């Protein structure tokens, strides 16, 4: 079972992973789809590569568990990114779906075993 400190570390790593992956994908999108240039896309590729290392620092030893749980963080984080960066307005179903995903994260990562 994870201690409080390890849960906080794990949660912080999930937030960092989300910033790197979602931010990296957004930078690639800006570079390619919004024609901002290859420097934007290149920065996105670097961020996406850095994201790939973050999972290795999770306190849980099971890659599949970590990546499955991160999927829920990615869903909620992507919606939040859209709100903050792109002016997206999620509807109640977006928010409900994100909440379900985050409950899943809690169960997958932090339920007693």
UniProtKB/Swiss-Prot annotation:
<feature type="transmembrane region" description="Helical">
    <location>
        <begin position="12"/>
        <end position="32"/>
    </location>
</feature>
<dbReference type="Pfam" id="PF02694">
    <property type="entry name" value="UPF0060"/>
</dbReference>
<protein>
    <recommendedName>
        <fullName>UPF0060 membrane protein Mkms_2558</fullName>
    </recommendedName>
</protein>
<keyword id="KW-0472">Membrane</keyword>
<dbReference type="InterPro" id="IPR003844">
    <property type="entry name" value="UPF0060"/>
</dbReference>
<feature type="transmembrane region" description="Helical">
    <location>
        <begin position="37"/>
        <end position="57"/>
    </location>
</feature>
<comment type="similarity">
    <text>Belongs to the UPF0060 family.</text>
</comment>
<feature type="transmembrane region" description="Helical">
    <location>
        <begin position="92"/>
        <end position="112"/>
    </location>
</feature>
<dbReference type="GO" id="GO:0005886">
    <property type="term" value="C:plasma membrane"/>
</dbReference>
<keyword id="KW-1003">Cell membrane</keyword>
<keyword id="KW-0812">Transmembrane</keyword>
<keyword id="KW-1133">Transmembrane helix</keyword>
<feature type="transmembrane region" description="Helical">
    <location>
        <begin position="66"/>
        <end position="86"/>
    </location>
</feature>
């Amino acid at each position: 079972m994870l201690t409080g400190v390890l849960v906080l570390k794990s949660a912080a790593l999930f937030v960092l992973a989300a910033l790197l992956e979602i931010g990296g994908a957004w930078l690639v999108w800006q570079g390619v789809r919004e024609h901002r240039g290859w420097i934007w896309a290149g920065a996105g590729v670097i961020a996406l590569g850095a994201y790939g290392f973050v999972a290795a620092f999770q306190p849980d030893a099971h890659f599949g568990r970590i990546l499955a749980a991160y999927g829920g963080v990615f869903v909620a984080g992507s919606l939040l990114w859209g709100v903050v960066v792109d002016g997206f307005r999620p509807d109640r179903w977006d928010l409900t779906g994100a909440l379900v995903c985050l409950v899943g994260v809690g169960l997958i990562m932090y339920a007693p075993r």
